[in-house]
């Protein structure tokens, strides 16, 4: 079994040593649920890393949004550079699920756009899970959604060995069964190509390397690893294991069984519609399902094939669907599931099932889908919370649910390694908030510090951003329409000083590690509600706890109950921290953290790879690269993807001028 090797120049400090020791002991003693109550800036992520290293078991870390997942992915890759750290979030750039609105007789077709890089990372996560024990997967709520059967996925692997006897035709058919596509013109992820007795395979889960299998007759003579950009040999292998091109691969026998079961279900459902005299629903379901069945018989896939997941995976009606957690269980060993920011993540996990169910029940009732489509769903909360052998809930403000589950298995982490105290806070009159805050912003900019402002409405955030920009402040506005990658870019740009003030609504609370921020301004702090609850206020105020000059200004007309309770928690923690510093003669210092490289994810993996390494492209290779890009450019234009076509055109022009 691979061993986790934690790489850090720091030793645990503050409350970290006792928290690490307690949680490790809880889990060693068999506790299924434990909670780490850690104040903002106390190094909860580093504590988590130490716990993982101590336990030395596969670990899944789940959080409620993609921004935090990206941040955790960067941090854990830094902590465990010699181990396998993977990333598993939704692979959609855009997703509109199918739905039916009866009162308007409006059917909305499913519409989506898959991000190829995110798909590759998801595949990398599942293949690594089956191949390695020293693995950490950072995931969003996507981990709770349906995946293919991991046991079936394991049957869809192929091992190559030097000296192995295998007819080339047989191998090519096997590659197609595994989801790979032959393409002798454009060679990219998920493709293979054939040139005489040489077969090149580009694993769907690999970004930079492809495999070359060289035959002598029907015998494998050589196995090589090649750089996908430079087409140069990297190393020779004695053997190589290839995994399927997607997680929903189904063997021929299972597929035939699924088709038969779908036909039986369709027949039964149509009989129900006849008995209920529902002619429209009858015709609708018959037409749609028979079309899908024809597509599955011909090509093994159809649009919306996930709605037949129950049949394709061999599950029974109502049975728990397969998810990423089953890939951990497939290993047959204990594993740890960490729920980061659990006070937000757990309620979100709990709400996923109900929303999905209500939408699909309408589709089933009106004949758009078979009843089995209801089993293509996220895990219910009761299924999720009993799935893993060991849960660790991590939060500065855990909810009652986590505390009840954990009982006595709770560790506190209030003392920060840096000696930093919970921030000072001040309540100011809301009437003069905008001008008063402008003066505070100018003072912070003069010290090369950053400011976060949280508002209650999108309109106020937009107007405030526009107003301060007109006054010469470098300000940006983070709103809910910004995708995960752009949010990550904004946060990084703030840290680098490309702008000084970031304004948002509820996007500035959990998990944002911003040592450069010394001022948090909370507008309309006295407006009771979700965004100004005790928990939300504590979390928001905590964003200023990574800077020695951290301060929070709450603009309000009165002090609400939520504000008062948040102040009491802050005062309690600050008193305890001051006492610890006094006893140990500690002088508080701001957190020092490098600005990690951005998670490089774009819509066109091929173009990005060429752009990233264009300076390395040998002159002799440029024409072949230009040829490939030119084909992709015309394909994009034909598909009316003009922005992508223009980007590829510019890339071609740039390579030609090198």
From Swiss-Prot:
PROSITE patterns named in the record: HELICASE_ATP_BIND_1 (PS51192), HELICASE_CTER (PS51194), UVR (PS50151)
GO MF annotations, alphabetized: ATP binding; ATP hydrolysis activity; DNA binding; excinuclease ABC activity
UniProt entry keywords in alphabetical sequence: ATP-binding, Cytoplasm, DNA damage, DNA excision, DNA repair, Excision nuclease, Nucleotide-binding, SOS response
Domain of life: Bacteria
Record bears the keyword S-adenosyl-L-methionine: no
Domain annotation UVR: ranges: 623-658
Pfam families, per the entry: Helicase_C, ResIII, UVR, UvrB, UvrB_inter
One biological process term in Gene Ontology: SOS response
Motif Beta-hairpin per record, residues: 91-114
Residues the entry annotates as binding ATP: 38-45
InterPro entries: Helicase/UvrB_N (IPR006935), Helicase_ATP-bd (IPR014001), Helicase_C-like (IPR001650), P-loop_NTPase (IPR027417), UVR_dom (IPR001943), UVR_dom_sf (IPR036876), UvrB (IPR004807), UvrB_inter (IPR041471)
Disulfide links within the chain: none
Main location: cytoplasm
Record's GO cellular component terms: cytoplasm; excinuclease repair complex
Domain Helicase ATP-binding: 25-416
SUPFAM superfamilies: C-terminal UvrC-binding domain of UvrB, P-loop containing nucleoside triphosphate hydrolases
Location relative to the cell: Cytoplasm
Residue span, Helicase C-terminal domain: 433-607
Family membership: Belongs to the UvrB family.
Comment text on domains: The beta-hairpin motif is involved in DNA binding.
Protein function: The UvrABC repair system catalyzes the recognition and processing of DNA lesions. A damage recognition complex composed of 2 UvrA and 2 UvrB subunits scans DNA for abnormalities. Upon binding of the UvrA(2)B(2) complex to a putative damaged site, the DNA wraps around one UvrB monomer. DNA wrap is dependent on ATP binding by UvrB and probably causes local melting of the DNA helix, facilitating insertion of UvrB beta-hairpin between the DNA strands. Then UvrB probes one DNA strand for the presence of a lesion.
Subunit annotation: Forms a heterotetramer with UvrA during the search for lesions. Interacts with UvrC in an incision complex.
Protein name: UvrABC system protein B
Taxon lineage: Bacteria, Pseudomonadati, Campylobacterota, Epsilonproteobacteria, Campylobacterales
Gene that this polypeptide is encoded by: uvrB
């Amino acid at each position: 079994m691979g061993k986790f090797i934690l790489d850090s120049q720091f030793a645990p400090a503050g409350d970290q040593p006792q928290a690490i020791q307690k949680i490790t002991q809880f889990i060693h003693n068999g506790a299924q649920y434990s909670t780490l109550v850690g104040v903002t800036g106390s190094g909860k992520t580093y504590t988590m890393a130490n716990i993982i290293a101590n336990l030395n078991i596969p670990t899944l870390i789940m959080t409620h949004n993609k921004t935090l997942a990206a941040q955790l992915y960067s941090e854990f890759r830094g902590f465990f550079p010699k181990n396998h750290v993977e990333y598993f979030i939704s692979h959609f750039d855009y997703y509109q699920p199918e739905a039916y609105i009866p009162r308007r007789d409006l059917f909305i077709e499913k519409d989506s756009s898959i991000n190829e890089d995110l798909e590759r990372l998801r595949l990398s996560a599942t293949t690594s899970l089956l191949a390695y024990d020293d693995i950490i997967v950072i995931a969003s709520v996507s981990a709770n959604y349906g995946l293919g059967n991991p046991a079936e996925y394991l049957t869809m692997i192929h091992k190559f060995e030097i000296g192995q006897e295998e007819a080339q035709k047989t191998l090519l058919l096997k590659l197609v069964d595994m989801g790979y596509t032959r393409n002798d013109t454009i060679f990219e992820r998920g493709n293979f190509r054939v040139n005489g007795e040489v077969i090149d395979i580009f694993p769907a889960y690999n970004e930079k390397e492809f495999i070359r299998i060289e035959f002598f007759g029907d015998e494998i003579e050589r196995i090589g690893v090649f750089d996908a950009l430079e087409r140069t040999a990297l190393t020779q292998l004695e053997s190589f294991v290839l995994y399927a091109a997607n997680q929903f691969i189904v063997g021929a026998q299972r597929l035939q069984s699924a088709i038969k079961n779908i036909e039986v279900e369709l027949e039964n459902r149509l009989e129900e519609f006849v008995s209920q005299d529902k002619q429209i629903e009858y015709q609708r379901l018959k037409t749609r399902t028979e079309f899908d069945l024809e597509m599955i018989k011909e090509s093994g896939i159809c649009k919306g094939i996930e709605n037949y997941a129950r049949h394709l995976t061999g599950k029974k009606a109502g049975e728990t669907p397969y998810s990423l957690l089953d890939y951990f269980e497939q290993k047959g060993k204990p594993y740890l599931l960490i729920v980061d920011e659990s006070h937000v993540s757990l309620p979100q996990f709990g709400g996923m099932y109900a929303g999905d169910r209500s939408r699909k029940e309408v589709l089933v009732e009106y004949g758009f889908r078979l009843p089995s489509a209801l089993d293509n769903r996220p895990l219910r909360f009761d299924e999720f919370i009993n799935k893993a052998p060991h849960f660790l809930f991590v939060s500065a403000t855990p909810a009652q649910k986590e505390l009840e589950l954990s009982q006595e298995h709770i560790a506190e982490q209030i003392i920060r390694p840096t000696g930093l105290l919970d921030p000072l806070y001040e309540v100011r009159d809301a009437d003069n908030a905008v001008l008063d805050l402008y003066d505070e912003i100018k003072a912070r900019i003069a010290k090369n510090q950053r400011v976060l402002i949280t508002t209650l409405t999108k309109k106020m955030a937009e107007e405030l951003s526009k107003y301060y920009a007109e006054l010469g402040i470098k300000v940006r506005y983070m709103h809910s329409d910004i995708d995960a990658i752009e949010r990550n870019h904004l946060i990084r740009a703030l840290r680098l000083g490309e702008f000084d003030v970031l304004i948002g609504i509820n996007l500035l609370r959990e998990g944002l590690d911003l040592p450069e921020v010394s001022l948090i301004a909370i507008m309309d702090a006295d407006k009771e509600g979700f965004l100004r609850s005790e928990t939300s206020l504590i979390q928001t105020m905590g964003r200023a706890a990574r800077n020695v000059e951290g301060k929070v200004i709450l603009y309000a007309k009165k002090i609400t109950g939520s504000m008062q309770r948040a102040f009491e928690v802050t005062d309690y923690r600050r008193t305890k921290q001051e006492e610890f510093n006094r006893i140990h003669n500690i002088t508080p210092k701001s957190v020092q953290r490098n600005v990690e490289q951005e998670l490089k994810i774009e819509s066109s993996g091929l173009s990005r790879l060429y752009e990233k390494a264009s300076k390395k492209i040998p002159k002799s290779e440029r024409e072949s690269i230009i040829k490939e890009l030119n084909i992709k450019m015309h394909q994009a234009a034909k598909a009316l993807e003009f922005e992508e076509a223009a980007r590829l055109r510019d890339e071609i022009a740039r390579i030609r001028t090198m």
